[in-house]
Amino acid sequence: VWVEKIGELRLDTHTYHIGKSPFTARGETSIGYWKEGSVKGVHKDYKVEVSHDPINLWKDGTLRFFGGYQRDYYGYDKSIRSMPYWGAQFRTAVGPRVNAWVSYNQRNINYNNSPYRFDSTELPKELIYGGSFKLTRLDDISVSVKQNMMNGDVDSIYYTYHRDLHSFDMYLTYKDSHKNNNNQWKIKFVGKDF
C-alpha cells in the first residue's frame, strides 16, 4: 500500500530559550491531505517540546533530556490522537569526520488510534543508535538502528545519504524493516535559513 501526502505543509520553529534559563522550547505543526488505499482525508498535527542546553560530558560529548506533547487530528474519521512523550539523547564526535549517537524515546500512548497504517505508533519504547561519516564538506552518510525495548528485537535499520543544498538539506533514506517486508525509500527536502 502506497502512502500519498498531497500538498503537506510543515512548519518547525527554532529552539528558543525560556527567559535567561538553560531550558528551551520548540514546536512544529503540519497540515496536509493523506491517502493510504481507501483511507484518505485532511491530517493536522502539532507538537511542543521542552528541553535544555546540552550537558557537555566532555569536549565533543553531549547529553540532552526532553519531553513533549503531540496531537494529531484525522479528517478521515474525525479521530484525535494525543501522545505525551519523553526521552534522552547522547551524541559524540568519534573523530573529525565521524559522529555517533544513542537515544531512548518513550511515547505514552495506550493504543494507536490513527486510521493510517503507516502512521501507527508501533514502538512505544525504543532505543535508537547509529553513526555518521562526513564524505565531503556538503555530504555525509549515516546508519541508524531502531530497537524495540519491549522485546529487545531490532525493528528497522535506516541508511541515509545527506546533501547540503545551501538553502535546503536533502535526505535520501532506505529503511530496512528487518522483520517484515515494509522496506521503503524516502526522499525529503528540508528548508533552512527561512
Predicted features along the sequence, with ranges:
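Outer-membrane beta-barrel proteins and related beta-barrel translocases across Gram-negative bacteria
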Residues: V1-F194
